Amino acid sequence: MYRMAVEKLLKWRAGKHRKPLIIEGARQVGKTWLMKEFGRLAYSNTVYINFDSNSRMADLFASDLDTDRLIMGLELYVGHKIDPKDTLLIFDEIQEVPRALASLKYFYENAPQYHIVCAGSLLGIALHQGTSFPVGKVDFLKLYPLSFKEFLMATGKEGYAELIDKRDYQMISGFKQTYIESLKHYYFVGGMPEAVQCFVETGDFNEVRAIQRRILVAYEQDFSKHAPNEIVPRIRMLWNSIPSQLAKENKKFIYGLIREGARAKEYESAIMWLSDCGLVHKISRVNTAGIPLRAYEDLRAFKLFVVDVGLLGCMAGLRQRTLLDGNGLFVEFKGALTEQYVCQQLKCHDDIDVYYYTNDRGSCEVDFIVDTGDLIIPVEVKAEVNLKAKSLKTYYERFNPELCVRTSMADYKEDGWIVNLPLYSVDQLSKM
């Protein structure tokens, strides 16, 4: 299985000012596999330490954080010398030993020659709870479920993924049905590595759903195990409300759908907890096209998407029959899967920020507003071959952006003020 994050890791390895690297991401998106695969591809030796199951290593970091002493202890543990130039040190589940997190500062300052990558389940929460490590002493990389392009590669369609990157839309159009069929599979399977691997090996959608259910059960167990007791019920209710939130025509998050009379201040900490552990994407509203969009973010109005389109379908109870119902999967519960899919592909790009737009009267809504740093791109999402874009036209007439994008099942087309980008090519939005 190929992950494009490997390319980012190779750039990190070659960097002149390399710092210890922390890989963030939701549970089961493949952080451990990625670190080990990177070690296999780029180093002669890998030292893997799992702090969740290694009390000896926890004891090593419990006292002195002198880096020479720590390296000596690691060498004694693995039984050989550690070559700093060609050995990858992997610290997994590092949140279990806060002193190990703190040691990254000293490795950066006193022993930068060592190549260290770290990860951990719910690490985002540990970092936001004030675990000691100084800002500026580490690098970060966010890992998400497989993108649609990675899914194509995992399912033996590497050439189709390459064609998307080449942006030869005339040729892409000629293979449209293959892209649509793969996109249907991706909506159902999603990008969680275990689910994708199961699909590749068996093609059994029932087995895929069983894996997704197990992942969702593990997430709910994490709520009880790791969240503060007082907010666990609110996290669970909020999490379970997301499919119904996205099934609305207007997908703005409504607290009243969690329970009658629910208020924002009761659930703010629950949203932050889910966001910190990578389980939800919070997409805030803007009401203008000013640069940077972050300066105009309305934190009170937002949409909430989950980490993976396959998990959303599982949460919503979508059955395998939807795969056989023409292109019905794309429009199930008011196109929620399609908007989730587009959000998920956009969030894979760390160099863009994603928002949505409504005017102050609420009479005009654009599904996503993408800030690339150079451009503000409004994006309207259509689940079928619907080429109407009334709200996008209103936005265009008000702000006159350089580029307006409608993404749908229709072929690529430049039509005056608007570009139609096929849903299966939405990954290319940041390169337009």
Listing of model-derived features with the role each one plays in the protein:
Residues 34, 38:
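Hydrophobic positions on the alpha1 helix immediately C-terminal to the Walker A/P-loop
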Residues 53-85:
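Short glycine-rich substrate-engagement loop in P-loop NTPases that contacts/grips substrate
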Residues 128-247:
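Interdomain motor-coupling "hinge/lid" segment immediately C-terminal to the ATP-binding subdomain
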Residues 200-365, 369-371:
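Accessory nucleic acid-recognition modules appended to NTPase machines
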Residues 90, 115-121, 142:
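Structural recognition of the conserved hydrophobic beta-strand(s) that form the central parallel beta-sheet
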Residues 31:
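Conserved lysine of the Walker
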Residues 23:
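Hydrophobic anchor at the beta1->P-loop junction of P-loop NTPases
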Residues 1-15:
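Pre-Walker A adenine-sensing motif
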